[in-house]
Amino acid sequence: AVLTEDGVLGLAPSIRERYQRFPFDIEPVTGMPICDMAPGLKSWNYIEASIALAAVNAFFNRPDRMPDKAEIYPGGRRSRNVFTKFWESHTKDRRTLFSEPMYERDELRNIPGMIDILRRDEDRTYRDYLYTAYRELLPSCDQLTVSGKSFVSKLAGPMLRYAAELEKKTLLWGMDIPLCPSLMDRGIDHITGFIADDAEECFRLVKRGAVRDDILRFGHFVSIEKQ
């Protein structure tokens, strides 16, 4: 997580590796400008890329940057149910390929429609597909949904380019997704991200290693649709 001087929080996933294969290109330090941290998202050092994504989210995911037609969901404990309500109203009749969701397979069992899940080998269960299967799966799906974790792991780029070739609907969904309207100009159809209402408390929970649903209680989701 990254907390700005004016009290805005940006979240990002944590990807653990057995050993660090790549050094830091941009060493993050307290007080560093966001514009200096953001290029680290391109790094193959997953820690560096994760911190950079959190910095990007701290820049975009704030109430004063939301477009007028953004859909704002209820916060607090109700944030935990936003994904289910969104899926029921937007995608229940579609087959979806979901890359590295922040939800476990069992949490999606009551979600309408068909969802195929892609994960890196380190995170995969026997019911998930290995990430390299996207070329076989995506042609038979109606849409591709990508999490922030896939931007850190570098899976998002190839998948989104392939989805564009196939003219599939593309969605970015998760508490680690930047609410950046200009992404719509790059072919993204829908974005749902998270805004922390109590940034200090969210930051404290992240440092403590709290579970996802505890953090969600102190913020709300926002959706942006391509017009």
Role assignments for model-derived ranges:
Residues 1-102, 226-227:
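Electropositive, gly/pro-rich neighborhoods at or near active sites that engage anionic ligands
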